[in-house]
Amino acid sequence: LILVKQTIHFFNKEQIKSLLYHAKSKLNKSGKLLIFSLKTKNNQIPCFKQMKIKLKKSLKNDELLFRIIKIRLINSKESYFNFKVNITKKKYIEMIKKRYISCLLNMPIKSLSTGINELNSKYKMNIKFTDTLKCISYKKN
């Protein structure tokens, strides 16, 4: 089993091609390759304005990478996993401060603070949403 979880967006096209080539060659006869990433359309992750812009841009890039993956992994299957999330606003804001999602990694502290204020006014004590992961599975023949 080779598992790639929510990291494909850190790679460029050539790196993805190389990763897939090496992963396929290292798989055992009955091995599986699983690639997980955020669902790229209709994502429900609670965002502040600037975070949403960065997330959309990142997910658009993921779409391109998924096309490359589907071409390279012939006969792969695509599925989705839904996770019902119920989190306190306080805990979610702590996660934002720690930049839990990669679109926040290079965001200036001032923008992050503005976004946190936006989330504080937008949400009540609890935040509920469905987090959906896309999974591409490939089995070596």
Segments from the language model and where they lie:
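A conserved beta-strand element that flanks and buttresses the S-adenosyl-L-methionine
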Residues: 3
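Short catalytic micro-motifs in class I SAM-dependent methyltransferases
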Residues: 6-7
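Non-membrane alpha-helical structural segments and their capping/turn regions in soluble enzymes
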Residues: 13-17, 113
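A short glycine-rich, Lys/Arg-flanked "PGG" loop and its adjoining helix->strand segment in the class I
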Residues: 17-32
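Conserved class I S-adenosyl-L-methionine
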Residues: 32-62
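Active-site capping/gating segments
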Residues: 55-77
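Conserved Class I S-adenosyl-L-methionine
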Residues: 76-141
